[in-house]
């Protein structure tokens, strides 16, 4: 269990420990290759890495476009690459993207390929990701989340060569502390409108998202990648 803040990792670990799981914690900055490599090293010292669940990220209301691209896009590519180098045969990964990535307008075939295949260290240098092309934090967030889905599609091939799988989940509005704050804030009417016109007609719960993640990580999801 890793987080950029040790206290967050410890709090989550206590919940799991009280439910009967053995948990180790670490800090990680996903925008730093050195930090991610240290996390991979710590994980491999515990044994085979058979599962990776990645939910790190910052939202448009929390950060600048530069930070969003560095954490949500570059960081995701970095974690996929580094853990993809050690994932065990039969292992699986899940990356939490967002429905926001699917609300971005269509990209060109070339842009899709660049987001999917550009070496991680060259990602943020792409012309399409420069600040004169990124309109605001929402645009940075949407293109990062679109990039997450594209990146996982490409990584699924590489992970597959190791006998492992990787998928993304792009949830809609899920009721968390952050979502409740947004519903009560200035953007609340827009979020409530999204819920009203959605097919489900309501927000989701973390448990409901978790059941999808459990399927993708389990042998029952062995053909899904």
Residue ranges, per PLM feature:
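Conserved Rossmann-fold cofactor-binding substructure of NAD(P)-dependent oxidoreductases
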Residues: 31-48
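Conserved glycine-rich Rossmann-like NAD(P)H-binding loop of the short-chain dehydrogenase/reductase
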Residues: 1-12
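Alpha-helical segment proximal to the catalytic Tyr-Lys
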Residues: 85, 157-158, 222
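C-terminal substrate-recognition "lid" of short-chain dehydrogenase/reductases
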Residues: 202-225
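Catalytic loop of short-chain dehydrogenase/reductase
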Residues: 58-62, 89-162, 171-176
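Rossmann-fold cofactor-recognition segment
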Residues: 16-34
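Catalytic Tyr-x(3-8)-Lys segment
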Residues: 133-134, 138, 189-208
